Amino acid sequence: KMKQMFGKAPKVFRNSSLIYNDEIGAMVASMGFKGMLTEGAKHVLGWKSPHYVYHCNMNPNLKLLLRDFKLSDDISLRFSNSEWNEYPLFADKYISWIDAFPQEEQVINIFMELCSLGMSQPLSSNILEFLKALPYCAKEKGITFSTPTEIVTKLKSVSQLDVPYPMSWVDEERDTSCWLGNVMQREAFNKLYSVAE
């Protein structure tokens, strides 16, 4: 449908709440996608950095782009929080944080939902002015922007990423427990799956 309507076929997949595990990655790869966006969860990465391209351990053809949750949440959650120790956040300061990362780190992925603009961050917070200024401040530091498709096309994976259990960008746990964390949720989930079988 996308190809028919827009003349383009998507090459990178983004699941709701960035939910991912190895099995999901294998399914996404089998659908022909070349990359997938997911969370840079510490409990999965361990000592690894989210600033590199990884690949699915069940299909090395699927590259994984991991969200830098701190930098993403600085915009989507904390930007207008006057209690935050970095408030107010200006584009030049934000770009200086990105510029401070080691040169060898391949990519810094900033992912957020559009509902952050206007809901989590009211327009009165000057979020739009911040976003407009970002490319200019980045250009001054020699920092460039790329689409996910450009990244998975240009960059090689440095390693496979093993994710046996689902992870997401939700809550501190960065997993799916918020949806299956109590008896009622699990019962509804199991009923739904029993109907499918």
Residue ranges and their predicted role:
Residues 1-17, 96-111:
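CE4/NodB-like, metal-dependent polysaccharide N-deacetylase domain
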Residues 8-16, 74-89, 118-125:
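The substrate-binding groove and active-site-proximal loops of carbohydrate-active enzymes
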Residues 13-20, 41, 149-152:
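Short, solvent-exposed turn/loop segments enriched in Gly/Ser/Thr/Pro and often Arg
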Residues 52-53, 57-62, 66-69, 81-82, ...:
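Active-site and substrate-binding clefts of carbohydrate-active enzymes
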